[in-house]
């Protein structure tokens, strides 16, 4: 059927396909720019219509959610890293560390592996030990002040990486709407920076769909069925 084939098109085996996208429950306005951010995906997708989309940017290494998980492990925070880092960041000094944003050839592409390495090197320097990652010894040496300061610095930089590329895509393509989907869409720092960067109201996939891929796929199939 039409909805089934549409879902297959969207969630196909091609790893570049926007698996984590759930279009908003109300009628979306096209053209639509989607930022898909999760443990498995960091993608910018431009939709001209349902099923008519173009991948314009993606991570060249770690997905942003994966970077959150790895950094959480480095500084001794639990899994999943996203919520743990967001909570620790509330207690940190955002000026404590200046972390790098990767410069890439792809205009809308992301990279987080250099940021993760910068966190590791900074923590090694701060504790005076060069334990490698992953290591149980390193997080044990991280005190609360370092943990909180690194959490807020990493979160700010990772989010700014996403927001800068999303703003560049928005400015160039002038979409009618912007949608954020995936587990990292729940991050409040991401929402704050996007509000400041974009002159448009941003729509978010429902939180329950942000973290449950099966529910997202079902929602997408249902939505397609309504319009076919």
Predicted features along the sequence, with ranges:
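Acidic, glycine-enriched active-site microenvironments
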Residues: 1-12, 18-228
């Amino acid at each position: 059927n039409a909805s089934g084939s549409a879902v297959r098109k969207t969630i196909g085996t091609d790893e570049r396909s926007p698996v984590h996208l759930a279009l908003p429950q109300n009628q979306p306005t096209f053209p639509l720019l989607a930022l898909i951010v999760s443990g498995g995906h960091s993608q910018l997708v431009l939709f001209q219509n349902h099923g008519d989309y173009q991948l314009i940017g993606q991570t060249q290494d770690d997905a942003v959610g994966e970077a959150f998980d790895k950094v959480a492990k480095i500084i001794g925070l639990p899994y999943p890293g996203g919520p743990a880092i967001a909570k620790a960041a509330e207690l940190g000094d955002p000026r404590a560390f200046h972390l790098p944003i990767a410069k890439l050839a792809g205009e809308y592409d992301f990279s987080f592996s250099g940021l993760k390495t910068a966190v590791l090197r900074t923590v090694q320097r701060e504790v005076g030990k060069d334990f490698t990652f992953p290591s149980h010894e390193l997080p044990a040496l991280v005190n609360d002040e370092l943990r909180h300061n690194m959490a807020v610095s990493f979160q700010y930089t990772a989010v700014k990486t996403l927001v800068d590329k999303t703003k560049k895509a928005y400015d160039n393509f002038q979409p009618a709407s912007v949608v954020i989907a995936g587990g990292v869409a729940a991050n409040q720092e991401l929402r704050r920076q996007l509000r400041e960067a974009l002159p448009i109201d941003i729509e978010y996939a429902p939180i329950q769909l942000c973290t449950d891929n099966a529910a997202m796929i079902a929602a997408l199939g249902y939505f397609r069925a309504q319009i076919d």
